[in-house]
């Protein structure tokens, strides 16, 4: 059976190491010797069966395998009776308390031994196939993914095939050439024949590809991976010159000015392009060359398909100026750089590029910044030295990305351990049930303290285009190493709240110096407009977004300011100022003033805020209202709050909830869920946003209606049902945060019970 392991390394693996003894690490292992009881196996198979039956209705999985494991290991039984509130009944204090206690006890049972909450964070369907392709090329596929792994990877691909035969950019998306081609190749590498797979998956996928222009219409990232694999020619890709990494730093397009994820993708990509690396041409590769195209492979005019992209994949059409730039590099520059004496310059550029790759790998303990970058960096290390330690260290960290659910095996974006735990802890603290939660809170506090980044990147980090990280929290764990402003703000908030509580209940409070380091991170990331960047200070100009080389993302070339990061930081610094009023007071006051101005400036005409990391206007509005309320802005003294309240009240549905489609994110306008369905996570966000605004004092009726929906939606064991996907990044790609369905209904009910006057049965 599959088992989730927590905070485990391998003492016998010289290529695996950690900065804090693997706190937060979560890895899946298949134990062939543990067969489990018939009841355990039945639970798992039933979860798989139900997902398969409902996969077109609810596309994100319930993340049930590890939940079943944890609840079984802890002998969890929900002993608090369930409550329902009738249509003509008022929500009482007792009903809210009972529902909250049931949710709190269930959620506490899901806590891992090191104090964090594990969870799937996946959904994009281009994450896993490149890893399979990389392992196939390097000859490590069978050792990294033996039979049971392959079985689960194929299950995942089958589960998320669309009814038209293709695969979406993410699990809820329409079919795209990029992910259909990658999924088809992945199935073939894993042993399926051209017409194999469940429900003729391969034949249906290949038909979709050929019906939509064949693999020549794959977008740029697809062209790169297909070229690497040997089923496409590098001549059909736009240039990615590694000389970019030796440009003078004063140039506006210097890598130091790029968004870190963009920089980290094109760093190893440019190395592989500069080498024109192609994997071994095996019989399977020759077959794929025949299967993926509508014409013979050797008759394709590769130079003419560089700019070709299927219409289904285009979110960001390239402007003419960008195509002219690539054409100039393709026609003029590349022929020179591959010939003497200019090839000496290319050799230097390749060496510099790999120097940066190794630096980033070492400073993330070979996790790297994310899954797309992980696979590219790993392959670049193998191309440089197939038997080298760099590649072996990469292999040791593959398990950090693998996740198993009832829908199969997938690749995480990377872990969300700190992110989910920070919000989960705040939800539990808001419940005012501390006396029932002591061990849970103490473990959570311990995890957060141990996960703070204690050092900056190594050496002369500024010359490697890195920002300070000392005092930050990452999205996942300490080993990951990459500072994030909102993760830092949420971690800081937790530690500040814990510092006001009895140590015998929640453990020793964090040293002030460590808190000061966190404040320093937040202050360092504010832009002139008052907004907060996520990873690094904004240093580049917006016009550089014209050079966005992808077709399916927006706003990826440079760092930007974000509503959520700004609002989180306001809340953290307001609380910090109360507890440490003498530390950098003037800077913090200025920060808050400018941050409020930013939130007011970027509010949408309808009163909402665009959410960059969640769906979408509901999410952004919850954050913004929380930030404004923390800074003393109210319905009475702030027009932005009044407009936001009107937006939320107008978008409330007949059943009392809120439900927003993921389509709001790419379209940048509010789109309700099909059929005006409610989503419990969205309902939690909206309910908390209204509570922040003081809605209870004006008219609590909308709050009671929302709370009634949450109470009546709770399941028998205290869980809440999995519904639509709720996370997003770069405007157009969705992320499944599997614990959101627990955290936000729980948190919203906690705030409701705490801050909204309710009738009591006793009265």
From Swiss-Prot:
GO terms for molecular function: beta-amyrin synthase activity. Belongs to the terpene cyclase/mutase family. Its EC number is 5.4.99.39. PROSITE patterns: TERPENE_SYNTHASES. The gene is BAS1. It comes from the Eukaryota. InterPro entries: SQ_cyclase_C, SQ_cyclase_N, Squalene_cyclase, Terpene_synthase_CS, Terpenoid_cyclase/PrenylTrfase. PFTB repeats lie at residues 100-142, 150-191, 441-485, 515-560, 592-632, 641-682, 703-744. This is Beta-amyrin synthase 1.
């Amino acid at each position: 059976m599959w088992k989730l392991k927590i905070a485990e390394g391998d003492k016998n693996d010289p290529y695996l190491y950690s900065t804090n003894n693997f706190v937060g690490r979560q890895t899946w292992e298949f134990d062939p010797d543990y067969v489990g009881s018939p009841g355990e196996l039945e639970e798992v198979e039933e979860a798989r069966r139900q997902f398969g039956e409902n996969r077109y209705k609810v596309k994100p999985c319930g993340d049930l395998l590890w939940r079943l494991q944890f609840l079984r290991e802890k002998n969890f039984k929900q002993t608090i009776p369930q409550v329902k509130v009738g249509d003509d009944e008022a929500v009482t204090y007792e009903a809210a308390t009972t529902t909250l206690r049931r949710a709190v006890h269930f959620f506490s049972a899901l806590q891992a031994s090191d104090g964090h909450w594990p969870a799937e964070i996946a959904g994009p369907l281009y994450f896993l196939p490149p890893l399979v392709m990389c392992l196939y090329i390097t000859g490590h596929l069978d050792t990294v993914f033996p039979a049971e792994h392959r079985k689960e990877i194929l299950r995942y691909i089958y589960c998320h095939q669309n009814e038209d035969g293709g695969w979406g950019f993410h699990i809820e998306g329409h079919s795209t050439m990029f992910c259909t081609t990658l999924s088809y190749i992945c199935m073939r590498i894993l042993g399926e024949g051209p017409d194999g797979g469940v429900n003729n998956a391969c034949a249906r996928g290949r038909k979709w590809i050929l019906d939509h222009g064949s693999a020549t219409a794959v977008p740029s990232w697809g062209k790169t991976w297909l070229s690497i694999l040997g089923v496409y020619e590098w001549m059909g890709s736009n240039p990615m010159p590694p000389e970019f990494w030796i440009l003078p730093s004063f140039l506006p397009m210097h890598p130091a000015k790029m968004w870190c994820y963009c920089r980290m993708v094109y760093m190893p990509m440019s190395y592989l392009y500069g080498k024109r690396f192609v994997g071994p041409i095996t019989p399977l590769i020759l077959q794929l060359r025949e299967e993926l195209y509508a014409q013979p492979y050797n008759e394709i005019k590769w130079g003419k398909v560089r700019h070709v992209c299927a219409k289904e994949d285009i979110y960001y059409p390239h402007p003419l100026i960008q195509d002219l730039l690539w054409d100039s590099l393709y026609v003029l520059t590349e022929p020179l750089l591959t010939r003497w004496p200019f090839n000496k310059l290319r050799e230097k550029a390749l060496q510099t590029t790999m120097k940066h790759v190794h630096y980033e790998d070492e400073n993330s303990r070979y996790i790297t910044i994310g899954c797309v970058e992980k696979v590219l960096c790993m392959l670049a290390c193998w191309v440089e030295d197939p038997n080298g330690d760099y590649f072996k260290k990469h292999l040791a960290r593959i398990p950090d990305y693998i996740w198993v659910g009832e829908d199969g095996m997938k690749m995480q974006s990377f872990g969300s351990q700190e992110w989910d735990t920070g919000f989960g802890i705040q939800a539990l603290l808001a419940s005012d049930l501390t006396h029932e939660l002591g061990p849970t809170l103490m473990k959570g506090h311990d995890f957060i303290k141990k996960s703070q980044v204690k050092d900056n990147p190594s050496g002369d980090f500024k010359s490697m285009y890195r920002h300070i990280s000392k005092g930050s929290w990452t999205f996942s764990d300490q080993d990951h190493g990459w500072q994030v402003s909102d993760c830092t703000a949420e971690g800081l908030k937790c530690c500040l709240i814990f510092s006001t509580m009895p140590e015998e209940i929640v453990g020793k409070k964090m040293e002030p110096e460590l808190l000061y380091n966190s404040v320093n991170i937040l202050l360092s990331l504010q832009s002139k407009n008052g907004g907060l960047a996520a990873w690094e200070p904004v240093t580049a100009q917006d016009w550089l977004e014209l050079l966005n080389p992808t077709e399916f993302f927006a706003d990826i070339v440079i760092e930007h300011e974000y509503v959520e990061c700004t609002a989180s930081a306001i809340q953290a610094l307001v609380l910090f100022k109360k507890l440490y009023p003498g530390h950098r007071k003037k800077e913090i006051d200025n920060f808050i003033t400018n941050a409020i101005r930013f939130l007011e400036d970027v509010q949408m005409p309808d009163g909402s805020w665009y959410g960059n990391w969640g769906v979408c206007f509901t999410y952004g509005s919850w954050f913004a209202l929380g930030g404004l309320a923390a800074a003393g802005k109210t319905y009475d003294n702030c027009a932005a709050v009044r407009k936001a309240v009107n937006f939320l009240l107008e978008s409330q549905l007949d059943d009392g909830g809120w439900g927003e489609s993921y389509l709001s994110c790419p379209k940048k306008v509010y789109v309700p869920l099909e059929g005006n369905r409610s989503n419990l996570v969205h309902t939690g966000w909206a309910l908390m946003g209204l509570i922040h605004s003081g809605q209870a004092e004006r008219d609590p009726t909308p709050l009671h209606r929302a709370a009634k929906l949450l109470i009546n939606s709770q399941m028998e064991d205290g869980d809440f049902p999995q519904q639509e996907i709720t996370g997003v990044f770069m405007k157009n790609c969705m992320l499944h945060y599997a614990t959101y369905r627990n955290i936000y209904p729980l948190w919203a009910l906690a705030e409701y019970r705490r801050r909204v006057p309710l009738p009591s049965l006793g009265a």
